[in-house]
Amino acid sequence: MALLTAQGVKKVFQFQKPEGREHLRRLLNWEEFDELRDSRRSILLDTLYESIIFAVGKGFPWREVAQVVKFTEELLKETKGCSITEAVTILGNKLRDYQGQFNTTHLLALCDYFHNTFIRHYKLYQYVLGQDQDVNLTVTNLEVCTPPQPLPLAEGKDREVWKHEQQLEELSTAEVQKRTNMLLLKGALRLEQQHLLQETFSQLPGRRHQTLNREELEKLITEAIHIQIECLKELLQYEIQITFDILDLKLQKKTLNLNAPIPPLVPIAGQPGQDEALKLSKTHKGKKAKAKK
């Protein structure tokens, strides 16, 4: 792919989407193409453009935004024709290869983005981008029918009850997302720790096959312990924050359940004894009116 610059992706973002996509196409040195006839290239361009929007929205520096586009295009090429298991492995390896390009927060955001888009809809990406499509277009005149009659109100759900259920579902989804982010961070920190330890060991000046003296060994052990403590401290801080966030979500759910709206009681026509009670009430009122006269 063409080498994208920070200034180039910045201009892409500043344009409206149609102009931004067109500017990105020129930066990639792609020839002009028919959006309707070449849907594969159109979708690929959309995917690369959306990666820019994602990276800018997450606060990536412009230099890293260009790297995100490069990462996206490489991932799409390398996973072509692969199974989803192989694709997950390739994604993990690429994230490891790009550790030097992004900090831990941005690397975690990138991992989360591709898990929620590319991996979640992997079969669709493979179907659209991974194989040639035989276009067999058939035009058929169809009659447009009016919508069916709505269901009786008795079968509906009270608006406040529906809103309450939606709020509970949103809180549950947020809790699951918090736990998922925690798992992703653990993986990212583990990779960062391995990388830092490898750097520390590689700095030994040609002593890999020689015995270290006591001072060198103590220094090496101290540095390794320091790296592990720093990674563990960052992990604990994040775990504490996540735990408080999850407890807050649980408290909100508990409060919502305590204040749950009571659905209105809708009388059902034809209920046993209801018609008879109504008749007795009318008869009783008629007798009172006659007595007053």
From Swiss-Prot:
InterPro entries: CLAMP. It comes from the Eukaryota. This is Uncharacterized protein C8orf74 homolog. It comes from Bos taurus (Bovine). The lineage of its organism: Eukaryota, Metazoa, Chordata, Craniata, Vertebrata.
